[in-house]
């Protein structure tokens, strides 16, 4: 995956998509092989926190936000570092920190919901908030797991816009089963099967690949 690229990852259940993200983020250690971030960072020699600090952020399928805190506070907590929840919320934000939060709120489309409790947001809004929480940590690479699951069509369209806007400033890898959503992202697509790359290309190339039709899209 190139710097600033948006890449979609598809494949049947058990193809290795989640395992790949687990290895990249340090949650799972492979028995053999290598895993490099850029040309010089060996992820297999790093802990999960070290990998996050190196610039890799992951958004799981189910949103994990602080439901009893406001949208603004969720973003504030995401840049807490070692201070902890209560010390962070009691501390004064400087002008740069406040502007950073405002910028992310605008990017994820929640500027009008900033004082709303996160638990009161729609499913799609929670997904956007969690992406915003990752952005507060200035990641170089974002791993996004099935963002379209459970979304309305309107939320899916907005999510396509959001993920597309992130490419360039960040590398973004999206794991997704919804082929209409993948097509809307207009990105390069990698197909995994049994832990290996089966095919790569744009959506038309992948959909017309006989191997892909046989093991995945023809199901």
PLM regions and their residue ranges:
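The feature captures the beta-strand-to-loop junction immediately N-terminal to the Walker
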Residues: 10-12
């Amino acid at each position: 995956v190139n710097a600033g690229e948006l890449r979609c990852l598809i494949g049947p259940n058990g193809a290795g998509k989640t395992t790949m993200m687990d290895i990249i983020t340090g949650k799972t250690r492979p028995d053999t092989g290598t895993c490099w971030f850029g040309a010089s960072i060996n992820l297999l020699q790093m802990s999960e926190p070290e990998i996050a600090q190196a610039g890799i952020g992951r958004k799981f399928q189910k949103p994990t936000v602080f439901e009893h805190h406001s949208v603004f506070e969720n973003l504030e907590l995401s840049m807490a570092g070692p201070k902890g929840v209560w010390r962070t919320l009691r501390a004064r934000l400087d002008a740069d920190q406040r502007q950073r939060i405002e910028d992310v709120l605008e990017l994820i489309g929640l500027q009008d919901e900033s004082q709303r409790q996160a638990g009161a947001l729609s499913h799609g809004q929670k997904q956007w908030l969690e992406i915003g929480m990752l952005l507060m940590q200035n990641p170089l690479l974002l791993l996004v797991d099935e963002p379209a699951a459970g979304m309305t069509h309107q939320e899916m369209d907005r999510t396509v816009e959001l993920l597309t806007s992130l490419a360039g400033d960040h590398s973004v890898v999206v794991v997704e089963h919804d082929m209409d959503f993948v097509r809307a992202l207009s990105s390069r697509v990698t197909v995994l099967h049994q832990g290996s790359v089966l095919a790569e290309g744009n959506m038309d190339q992948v959909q017309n690949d006989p191997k892909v039709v046989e093991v995945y899209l023809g199901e």
